[in-house]
Amino acid sequence: MAMFTTMTALTLTSLIPPITATLINPNKKNSYPHYVKTAIASAFTISLIPTTMFICLGQETIITNWCWTTTQTLQLSLSFKLDYFSMTFLPVALFVTWSIMEFSLWYMASDPNINQFFKYLLIFLITMIILITANNLLQLFIGWEGVGIMSFLLISWWYARTDANTAAIQAILYNRIGDIGFILTLAWFLLHSNSWELQQVFLLNNNPNLLPLLGLLLAAAGKSAQLGLHPWLPSAMEGPTPVSALLHSSTMVVAGIFLLIRFHPLMENNPPIQTLALCLGAITTLFAAICALTQNDIKKIVAFSTSSQLGLMMVTIGINQPHLAFLHICTHAFFKALLFMCSGSIIHNLNNEQDIRKMGGLLKTMPLTSTSLTISSLALAGMPFLSGFYSKDLIIETASMSYTNAWALSITLIATSLTSAYSTRMILHTLTGKPLLPTPISINENNPTLLNPIKRLMTGSLFTGFLITSNIPPTSLPQTTTPLYLKLAALTATLLGLLVALDLNYLANKLKVKTPPPAFYFSTMLGFYPNIIHRMIPHLSLLMSQNLSLLLLDLTWLEKLMPKAISQHQTSASTTISTQKGMIKLYFLSFLIPLLLTLLMIS
């Protein structure tokens, strides 16, 4: 076990020198990005040793190195939990990040601040590793906030663009809503368990209150972009493509699902929170799939596919299968990073064109990118024997076996079919047909820093699911004993979506342009959610505050007290004065007649 913990600690500490190098020598040379890439590749190689030892021994470990602080009743220590989840995810995250770093050498070659960009990506990875290896809630919260702030910095990397700044602010604000739930959970456990160590929290709360679990679900919904807190995820595409690849594959967006996986010993005894997670995930996966159907930006399509897969992971949490959700996180990391890399390769070679309607014919001009895009899209759709199949098919089989509501299962199957449909649509628009770009361009697919990471991730997308399920079997995976028609449900849904997309694409080429129906606008405008939340509600609140200040203050109190009051007094005075006609004889006569009458009465 000493060897196991030593090699794991070496893996974690090998990522620190590139950060300290920037503090010692701020004027970094051009070799710094290569240094960071090599450090991550070395960390990945080292991490294979403790992961292999864990597979052989199967014994989880908790390393407690240093006591941070001690109050009267609470002790906080720096502790790492090296169990099935962290030891499996560590090499996956390092491998994917290594490939993304090498891809960034090609994609960001002309950026003057590429050294800082690589440093930010490395810190992003380190904060995610802190999150997955944390053994107490405070350490987990540090990693949680770390991925949040690094996502803000990386999404707004091109800070001169208004859209990039707006997207970064959206990401940080929506995540602050989720952080409210996390802090609520922290406070509840401190008050009731007097500890933030995970093993003590699980031991003392066999039947926990609904409140901390609701806080955890809110935190996960914010970080993993579930319905209601989802608009920041497609907006985050304003960042560079390597940022999108890292953000969506193995870091920030899966952090919320990973949080619920960590706390599954508490959730498995609480049916209401499981039902809530199931329904939330089912609605999210269907909504995101519907939105992806009509998007024309290639990165937005991949972003909504991420949101849909996160909903599927939430469904898996809801049917009490955390190991299955974790398996899908691991397989999803490979093909999602590959999808973004292929998108980045296409965008870069087509002079930053992202509209799939202006692409076409790339199958011959970019063969490796086209092959990789097809493989990753099929893995996303759950095509048999690709990496996504081993997790996605098992999720749907388990959901069909579980004693849960058929409504959630039905819309999950519909979302699976739609996933196949929008993946096929993207492939047909980008790779087949005639080139639709208005100007001739020079396509170069021969750079090794582009080809090598794509080849590595393509290999991962082909074989990772098989390797993980064969060599690292979790003890709680369900043994599915379903009838044949249920066994083929997921595959049938995938093939149905594929055929529908092919047929619709064939028909669309012969249709005349007409006014689209309202349902089309629901999909293209993302369910009108951004218009309502980001436009209508702020507009109504600003209008109400303007009317209050205008009607109550300016038009009522101020005018009644000052201008209108003075005006009314002056008007009445001037009216009184203006009634005087200046006829002095008549005035004296009117005075004299009453005087004479009075004298006569007296006498």
Swiss-Prot record:
It is an enzyme of class 7 (translocase). The keyword Translocase applies. The keyword Transmembrane applies. It is found in: Mitochondrion inner membrane. One of its GO terms (biological process) is electron transport coupled proton transport. NCBIfam families: NDH_I_L. This is NADH-ubiquinone oxidoreductase chain 5. The gene is MT-ND5.
